[in-house]
């Protein structure tokens, strides 16, 4: 994430927090990102320097007025005018980080060899919340490289309980033994 994205995303969060709109703006940013991912040609069009800025902002206005809060629309127009609309995902990420910090939320990703059952996911979620004392936003991923067990990534901190990690530790221990 660039410094520009941090600055813009943080500024939007500050504005939303002043008005008590943090959750609404977060949801709308997510929706706009999804729309732009589904329509990459539209993003290219909005980022084309040969089209006057006023026209590009007008396109945003036509597409989103009444669909998103005015703060989100104006934010997108500012990014469009500055030629930094491609920074939207970084701005949204910076916004989410500030939102999570303010609301006591930790993002966690559980990576396993097979999909977790709903019961396992619920149990893991509850355990992480009790250990951290924070609300957990848990995402799960499947990675065939994981032989067994689970690897957790909690905001950059990795907890590796996979069979691979245990085998590697055993290998290191055996190699360290001198006969």
Report residues per predicted region.
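Elongated, mostly alpha-helical coiled-coil "stalk/stator" tethers of large membrane protein machines
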Residues: 1-179
